[in-house]
Swiss-Prot record:
Name of this protein: Regulatory protein RecX
Native organism: Bacillus cereus (strain AH187)
Keyword field contains Cytoplasm: yes
Superkingdom of source: Bacteria
Classification of source organism: Bacteria, Bacillati, Bacillota, Bacilli, Bacillales
Compartments it resides in: Cytoplasm
HAMAP family the record matches: RecX (MF_01114)
């Protein structure tokens, strides 16, 4: 049995208190607690506490400490239930305490996976223009349940997906000016897949791109690559030269007809 002999406010934190006790051998430092725990257990000078009571006090102090750590972590941005659990595990908090903290956070509505999923979907679609497949995968990795994700993705209709994909295409295609139209389409297709768009949405967007095909830019790309390969393979003669040129330009996405026109032009120049 111990008796509380003194309670003093810590110098560095006005919300924490040092508790001094006497176990029959004079006053000594016992432990420190948060103000919440001080009030919860009615700690005051003269109070007698046994080992069981002390164990409860210290356990609740650990819960309160972990709770405040979680609140601080949440102050930067919203988090999912799993993210909070992982954060506390990294802080080497025990599972029993983690469960209590998460339960309290859920009760106090500091964490709500449904609200998180909806806001995350809106942000990733409107700001980062990610497709639904990537958004779903990221939410799953954050521990959000599949049913909640399905509900949140209703915030991202197909029309909006197409709009975002077309914006991404418009931005990215400028970097493919020296590619054949076919190769540009393939690269844009790969980009949209990485961004998380469905095959259906990609097909619709690339069909629109087909209508914008620029013959002049296609010729410029053909001449750019054709002249590069011409310098590379001009040391070869006849069939070998033409075969290497055709293979190289075909791999770049140019049609046989386009390649023949280019080679004919080179013959006439020669």
């Amino acid at each position: 049995m111990a008796v509380i002999t003194k309670i003093e406010v810590q110098k560095r934190s006005k919300e924490r208190f040092n508790i001094y006790i006497d176990k029959g051998q004079g006053e000594e430092y016992g432990f420190s607690v948060n103000e919440v725990i001080l009030i919860k257990h009615g700690l005051q000078k003269g109070l007698e506490i046994d080992e069981i009571a002390l164990g409860n006090i210290l356990y609740n102090e650990e819960v309160q400490k972990a709770y405040l750590q979680a609140i601080s972590y949440l102050s930067y941005q919203m988090r999912t239930k799993l993210e909070i659990e992982d954060f506390l595990r990294k802080k080497e908090v025990g599972q029993a305490i983690i469960s209590e903290v998460v339960s309290k956070l859920l009760h106090d509505r500091y964490i709500n996976d449904k609200e998180y999923a909806i806001l995350y979907t809106r942000t990733q679609s409107n700001v980062n223009r990610k497709g639904p497949t990537v958004i779903k995968r990221e939410l799953l990795n954050k521990g959000v349940q599949d049913l909640i994700i399905t509900h949140s993705l209703q915030e991202y209709p197909k029309e909006k997906q197409i709009e975002n994909a077309l914006i991404l295409i418009e931005k990215k295609k400028k970097s493919y000016q020296k590619h054949s139209f076919l190769q540009m389409k393939l690269k844009l297709d790969e980009m949209l897949v990485r961004k998380g768009y469905s095959r259906d949405v990609i097909q619709i967007c690339l069909e629109e791109l087909k209508d914008e095909k620029d013959d002049e830019k296609q010729r410029e790309a053909l001449h750019y690559h054709g002249n590069k390969y011409y310098e590379k393979y001009k040391k070869y003669d006849g069939w070998t030269f033409e075969n290497k040129m055709k293979q190289a330009l075909y791999r770049k996405g140019f049609s046989i007809d386009e390649i023949e026109i280019f080679l004919q032009m080179k013959r006439e120049e020669g």
